Amino acid sequence: MPSHFAARGANLLLALAALQQAASGAPTGTSTTASSTSLLGYNPANGVQFQDTDNIQYSLLPQQTEDANIGAFLDFNGVENPQPIRGSRGGLDPGPRKTEYDILNPDKLAPPGTDHGSVANAEWPLGLSHTKMGLGRAGWSRQQNVDNIPVATEMAGVDMRLEAGGYRELHWHTAAEWSYVLNGSVRIQAVTEDGQTFVDDLSAGDVWFFPAGVPHSLQALDGGVEFLLVFDDGSFSEDSTFLATEVFARNPKSVLSKNFGGLPLSAWDNIPSGELFIFPGTPAPKDIAEQNIVGSAGVIPVEQSYSYHLSKAADTVTTAGGSVKIIDPKTFPIASMFSAAVVTIKPGAVREIHWHTLTSCIAELLMSGILTLSSFFISGDARIGIYAAEGNARTFNYHAGDCGYIPKAMTHYVENTGTDDVVFIEVLQADHFSDISVGQWVGLTPPQIVMDTLNLTNSTVSQFKKEKQYVVQG
């Protein structure tokens, strides 16, 4: 072995020996493992550092000092550092937190004293849903399904926007589709399994329905369009539709040529390689007759029409507190298991406490409101209180663009908590629109039974109405 290699080897051995000696002679308790044990459990050396967490600036609303069971709405707008306090319940929250959430959801921060136990989540803001964006700035969609509201097993919702001339491409799906036009105008088109055709133009407030499996297309007219889609399957996804582009892209060109009567293979050279979903297109002709294509089977009979011009219909019920406009298979037969109500609630008024016997409800706020059962809020600000049996009850807050879902038989009310009208749609999977009004129920029950059960006086029970009130003035 060369002398320089031998010298380097000897030096390495000496260094290793020195490290071993240093390690064996190290003072006890200086290693990382040993010192960390002094932080486990009680040790008088680990003194507590007291901090005054109550020393925060905040203010309470007058309603927060009332009996918690009164449960008045808490408007935290302009309130300094809102706190989770109701009557004698709750306590201070020094943070960390985002007070914007508390302002939007005051009944989560400081719930009424009547809330109790657990109720499955019944609210989802579509603004928190992932937006699926179309091509060429032609539009977008966002959805709510069981991924967002797990209890919403019967229905799912999609909010879709098409810019002027924009298409929702030719497609079909395994779920039935019920739709309400929120704003703008749209041309809808479909072909049945018998070869009958359908085309119509719809405006804000109108409704359409396509049965499961029926292919259809949508195109926005001048000014664009936005609409709510409700599907009869809580797990429905916009990503699971059957698309015309994919039908052509996923079949061999030779088969396409045979299928269409011997067209040359070159006819398929420029078909899209995948989905278009939402894309810009040639503006629809002003004269709808130009797109009224008819084969030997003719057009769909009027009584089986896929559209209903609900915007032209009168309100079903008008009260001092608002109005209700009902559409169900009695007036729109093709939608055999979709019933809905467009509800307007004036500030301070309440959609009376009720429940649905036939189905769950999905609700959505439209312009500034909400939907129940399956509901969608169009406009306004509201809260829904849900009683779910076994002593369980919970209150949820809703704003424009929010969805709600209330399972069958659970009582609920919708209270307008803002200064503008609340407008929402409640959609049922039912062959007619119906509910059980708590007010009418006790009003039509012998007074003695009600007084004995609820410990109420005769003067109180005598004020109960024998007819549904639908929307009660605040």
What is the predicted role of each segment?
Residues A26-G29, A34, S203-A204, F209-A244, ...:
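Ligand-binding loop in jelly-roll beta-barrel domains
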Residues A26-E154, K258-V342, L456-G474:
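A short, N-terminal "cap"/entry segment at the start of jelly-roll beta-barrel domains
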Residues A164-Y167, W172-D194, P347-N392, A400-D402:
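Glycine- and acidic-residue-biased ligand/ion/polar-headgroup-sensing regions
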Residues G224-P285, D421-G474:
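Active-site-adjacent segment of 2-oxoglutarate/Fe(II) JmjC oxygenases
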Residues W172-A175, V191-D194, D222-G223, D232, ...:
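Short coil/turn segments at secondary-structure boundaries
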Residues M1-T28:
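Fungal secretory targeting signals
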